[in-house]
Amino acid sequence: MTVAHGVGPNGVAPPGSSGIQVIIVGLGIAGLVAAIECHYKGHVVVGLERSPGIRVLGSNATKVLQSWNNGEVLRHLVSQSDDVAAMEILDPAGKLYALDSMDGYGMGEGMIIHRGTLVHGLYEHAKSLGIDLRFASAATDYWEDEGQAGVTVNGEQRIAAACVVGADGVHSKTRDYVLGYQIAPQPSGLAAFRACFSANLLAGDPDAQWILEEAGVQDRMRRYITTGGLGLTLSTGKRGQNVIWQVWHRKHEKADESWENVTDARVEDALALLQDWPTYPQVAAVLRHTPSEKLADYKIISRDPLPTWRSRGGRIMVIGDAAHAMSAIAGQGGGQSVEDAATLAICLELAGKSRVNLALHVVERIRYQRTSIIQDSGNAIYSQMRDPDWETIEKDPSMMKFPRPEWLFGYDVHRDVYEQFPYAMRAVQDNTGYRPRNIPSNSKYQVVHDYEKPVAA
């Protein structure tokens, strides 16, 4: 069976030229990137978001954004991102043990950006393309038959398309339909206080100014690590305009699973965890300015890979956190959502209007093993920070660096999917095994640092 060549990794198809209609449920990172990528590949998109309005990417994800509008979208987002040259690794006394470069996340590669800023930028670009985005529109029911799939919006209006893509996050209703049941998260026993607020709130407090010493030039990031899984990451953002911090802890009874839900978290509770640190006066001087409405306490959860991402009828599937919720510590939730979205758009383009079911099956074949391996990375990464042996670390500071495997950070999803689609499609049609090229050689996540930063032209 022949395969269309498509417009290629950097190509843009005429709007609506594929004749494939796609309903996307959820307009977070995965949903908005899927809407934009599908539009660029000639598909007709309707995006649904139950909220009334719009509410950290590695180098593997920014390759996708670089292809939009001659790189202008990425340039704008980078201008709103954080500029961190290296992360300082310290003990609770403030002794510096390692400097971890931001290779894979730094300027010219990936970016460190507040989720709300990123989502807003994606939304503005999608809106500029004229994509049909509908807010206050909850998908309350799902259905499919041999020729189409659809949803009921707000319990009233039925809309149909060639396929439905659920990008509706960790509490996905689309996933419930796909599986036929709800899945429960597996608590890790960890939680994290999380806050981001304007650095202007530090004005007038001389004890807090140390964190802003490089404001206007670049940002700084400090990670304090101690025993028992307790740690603090404290940084500035947008060259000193924002202050961002997280406290990882095990007292998670009041924590919420969502990154965004503001709970009754109190900064006093976070500070109490750090009160025995020699650096407490210094860090408390900054943290105590956190507004209560900017603070959340969320649970670090884990989920096993789903048995499938696709419905029995084959026209409804999940992507992003709905398909493979990542531990926050892995730093790949947004990146893998972007890769899913790009893969979806290309597979629909290459399969064509008459083979939408096949396209969604190929998406799963190309993406499933990669995301499953990354889902399993949280424990390996966290083990670096749990109960550190500072004497050993002082002899070999590299052991505290964040893992940067080449197969993950060096991945070009556009190029890979265009090249691999025929092979993955044949495996689906013949019901044979398929090994994607986007996974490590031993099919396991390992703490390695073999990613090589691209040389500037």
From Swiss-Prot:
Pathway annotation: Alkaloid biosynthesis
Signal peptide region: none
Gene induction: Expression is decreased in presence of phenylacetic acid (PAA).
Cofactor dependence: FAD
GO molecular function, one term: monooxygenase activity
Record's keyword terms, sorted: FAD, Flavoprotein, Monooxygenase, Oxidoreductase
Functional note: FAD-dependent monooxygenase; part of the gene cluster that mediates the biosynthesis of the mycotoxin meleagrin. The first stage is catalyzed by the dipeptide synthase roqA which condenses histidine and tryptophan to produce histidyltryptophanyldiketopiperazine (HTD). HTD is then converted to roquefortine C through two possible pathways. In the first pathway, prenyltransferase roqD transforms HTD to the intermediate roquefortine D, which is in turn converted to roquefortine C by the cytochrome P450 monooxygenase roqR.
Family statement drawn from the similarity comment of this UniProt entry: Belongs to the paxM FAD-dependent monooxygenase family.
Protein name: FAD-dependent monooxygenase roqM
Gene name of the encoded protein: roqM
